[in-house]
């Protein structure tokens, strides 16, 4: 397993803040943060400041094309077509008999919907969805190798995002 440049930068940043890494027993070829060594400090950061959660082991599928929202509407349990630009929604992908294939969070921006799915399930979900793609003009792309993912929690999240990325949310 070879880490990308972005993974190395993220790992260095998190390690500098006390992250203890371990190889995941559940997610292949994945290093995850076990903890930062002080549960009380971690809890305090989430409640009073901000905390970064490394989530790169979660799956990320990008849906593009003029038919992708209609397709997702038919294949999942929530109202994807009413999802506004810049917003997100939780949904479930199920088989015809109701068996859950995966839980997902979908974010819509412009002509793309990003689908966050369970770790190690991107390929299975993409393959399953492809079986039901016939004449739809759309593309499903696995984005896991192209980017990293973090969550930022806590009341000072806006400040952290602005300071780190110069984005005002």
Where are these regions (language model features)?
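Basic, glycine/lysine-rich polyanion-binding surfaces/domains
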Residues: 2-169
């Amino acid at each position: 397993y070879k880490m990308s440049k972005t993974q190395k930068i993220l790992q260095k940043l998190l390690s500098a803040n006390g992250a203890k890494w371990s190889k995941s027993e559940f997610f292949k070829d994945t290093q995850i943060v076990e903890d930062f060594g002080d549960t009380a400090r971690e809890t305090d950061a989430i409640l009073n400041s901000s905390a970064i959660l490394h989530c790169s082991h979660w799956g990320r599928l990008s849906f593009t094309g003029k038919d992708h929202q209609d397709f997702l509407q038919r294949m999942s349990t929530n109202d994807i077509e009413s999802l506004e630009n810049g917003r997100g929604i939780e949904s479930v992908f199920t088989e015809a008999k109701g068996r859950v294939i995966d839980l997902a969070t979908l974010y819509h921006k412009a002509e793309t919907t990003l689908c966050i799915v369970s770790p190690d399930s991107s390929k299975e979900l993409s393959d399953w969805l492809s079986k039901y793609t016939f004449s739809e003009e759309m593309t499903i792309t696995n984005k896991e190798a192209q980017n990293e993912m973090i969550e930022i929690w806590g009341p000072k999240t806006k400040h952290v995002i602005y300071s780190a990325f110069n984005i005002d949310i």
